[in-house]
Swiss-Prot record:
EC category name: isomerase
A UniProt-annotated Pfam family: PhzC-PhzF
Protein name: Uncharacterized isomerase mll1393
Organism from which the protein derives: Mesorhizobium japonicum (strain LMG 29417 / CECT 9101 / MAFF 303099) (Mesorhizobium loti (strain MAFF 303099))
Any GO MF annotation of the entry: isomerase activity
Amino acid sequence: MQTRNYLLYDVFTTERLAGNPLAVVLDCKGLDTIAMQAIAREFNLSETVFVLPPDNPKHKNRIRIFTPDYEMPFAGHPTVGSAIALAELAGESGAGIFVLEENIGPVRCAVSRHDGAAFAEFDLAKLPEPLQLEADPQAIGAALGLAPHEIGFENHRVAFWSAGVPYVTIPVANLEAAGRIRLDNQAWSELAPRKSEWAFASPYVYCRETVNHESAFHVRMIVPGTPSYEDPATGSAAAAFAGAIMHFDAPTDGISQLWIEQGLEMGRPSRIRLELTVQGGKLASARIGGHAVKVADGKLFI
């Protein structure tokens, strides 16, 4: 039996018991995929990260990301949380830049102190791209319990985007409509595109109206399943959402930063920072950033 240390962080927040929880299991050399999946199921968090030595010695670590049911090629809150956890573990309290190896590819991360708390941001390894969506937007709205007039605002329309993980981006009229969504799993399974052989793409609902004045968008992300569940902060969805922002809002050339609020309806308020660099009217690069705070640590006897 081997002892392995783990850390528990709340990500995309500066407050404990808010944001999106993440388990980071250290020293995972020797663990196979089956064991990692079983441990992730034991933690039963939205994601668990397993830290391994890097394939490239110039990089900091390799990480593998698991939900309780499957491995993911990339996810935002595990990247932010892992970057902060590994920097703090190494005693790196100042600014630092390093690369984490994920299944999607190398991810460049920067860790610093921001607003008095640890803050990490990473460059998207893959820029968002539009995918074909065959489902009727009104049917998508109905699967969320919304009327046709509540779907869309300004020039924003239902779309399908991916920056490694695909999401159906669904604009709704206002906060009241966003607060009423209830996913009908049966209806969703009949119309939603798949993100993999075993899972449907998740709906990412957003509106321009926000609770916090510094936020640019209010969002909710529901993971379909039996039962479905809500995610308090979803970095990979924010990465995909960058495509919708570029397509519908057409930001001018330069660097723009905006905050996305999520998790308020479920009592886990979260804030995700999205940075867009636009050149010649096209998205040249994008970054996802956020805070994280350590909540607990412990040992696994596996």
